[in-house]
Structure formats: structure tokens, C-alpha cells
Swiss-Prot record:
This is Single-stranded DNA-binding protein. One of its GO terms (biological process) is DNA replication. CDD domains: SSB_OBF (cd04496). Keywords: DNA damage, DNA recombination, DNA repair, DNA replication, DNA-binding. Residues 1-104 form the SSB domain. Residues 119-130 have a biased composition (Low complexity). The gene is ssb3. InterPro entries: NA-bd_OB-fold (IPR012340), Primosome_PriB/ssb (IPR000424), ssDNA-bd (IPR011344). It comes from the Bacteria. Homotetramer. A motif (Important for interaction with partner proteins) lies at residues 158-163. It comes from Streptococcus pyogenes serotype M1.
Length: 163
């Protein structure tokens, strides 16, 4: 069976970071995720999805992702229940995030630069460090040569085309 969730959305407010009695970090947050279709009056609706993230990724999220941040989240969906103060059973469905990734720079979000930026923060939960080697000049191998650069017409008939 598969229980896999991938979301891209904006944080509706700053994450709420707490610690369990055994000092395990847990952060809760809500993502506003646009639907792919528009309503009858032409407006795009959004779903507000409750999420929870644990341990070091929770601390990273609380430190780096603020209200309005565009983030990508991977994880699983879970339903839990508890009894409230009135004795009623309450069911909660939420996404348990394994990791997240910032999808835009702070400058872009705040209206500064409009250039392309990959976010620069990939919160991979693996324990290995990922350091990149210094950039090296790669050989061109003729990539700048256009195969259509000589502008000679091609001798091909319509019968030779597969479509």
C-alpha cells in the first residue's frame, strides 16, 4: 500500500515550534494549496492543509520558512483521534511531513529580485553531508554548433513523415 503526499503551497502563518517532554522538536503549520480549477465565478480556490513535521526538519522549518513562504513538502497523510473536554471524539487528518524545500528566495517573496532562485535550502533528512566540488570547465563538444545552421533545405517528402 502507498501513502505518499507531495504538496506545493504557501505557509499561512509562521510554524508553531514546540518540544515534547523528551525534547523532540515538533512544528505544526498550514499550507495553502491552490486547486487546479477555478470556481464558477472564475476564482481559483485553495485548500488549507494542516501539516506536522518532527525533529531537525521541524527546527529548520521554524527558522527558515515564514508566513507566505512557498515550500514543497513530502510526507504521508494520517488520521488520528482524541477525546475533547466535552467528551466527544475528534478526528484530525493531517500531513506528516518528512522533509520540505524552500522554493523561492526571501527577496523574491518580498518583491525584490525576480530572478530564478532554487531556494537554496533543501532539508534532506539523510545523515550524509552534501558538499559540492568546485565548478570545473566542461568541454563544449560542439554543443554550440546548430544542426540547422547551414540553412540548406532538406530533401524530404510528405510520404517520408510518420505523421
Amino acid at each position: 500500500m502507498i501513502n505518499n503526499v507531495v504538496l506545493v503551497g504557501r505557509m499561512t502563518k509562521d510554524a508553531e515550534l514546540r518540544y515534547t517532554p523528551s525534547q523532540v522538536a515538533v512544528a505544526t503549520f498550514t499550507l495553502a494549496v491552490n486547486r487546479t480549477f477555478k470556481s464558477q465565478n472564475g476564482e481559483r480556490e485553495a485548500d488549507f492543509i494542516n501539516c506536522v513535521i518532527w525533529r531537525q526538519p521541524a527546527e529548520n522549518l521554524a527558522n527558515w520558512a515564514k508566513k507566505g513562504a512557498l515550500i514543497g513538502v513530502t510526507g504521508r497523510i494520517q488520521t488520528r483521534n482524541y477525546e475533547n473536554q466535552q467528551g466527544q471524539r475528534v478526528y484530525v487528518t493531517e500531513v506528516v511531513a518528512d522533509n520540505f524545500q524552500m522554493l523561492e528566495s526571501r527577496a523574491t517573496r518580498e518583491g525584490g529580485s525576480t530572478g530564478s532562485f532554487n531556494g537554496g535550502f533543501n532539508n534532506n533528512t539523510s545523515s550524509s553531508n552534501s558538499y559540492s566540488a568546485p565548478a570545473q570547465q566542461t568541454p563544449n563538444f560542439g554543443r554550440d554548433d546548430s544542426p540547422f545552421g547551414n540553412s540548406n533545405p532538406m530533401d524530404i517528402s510528405d510520404d517520408d513523415l510518420p505523421f
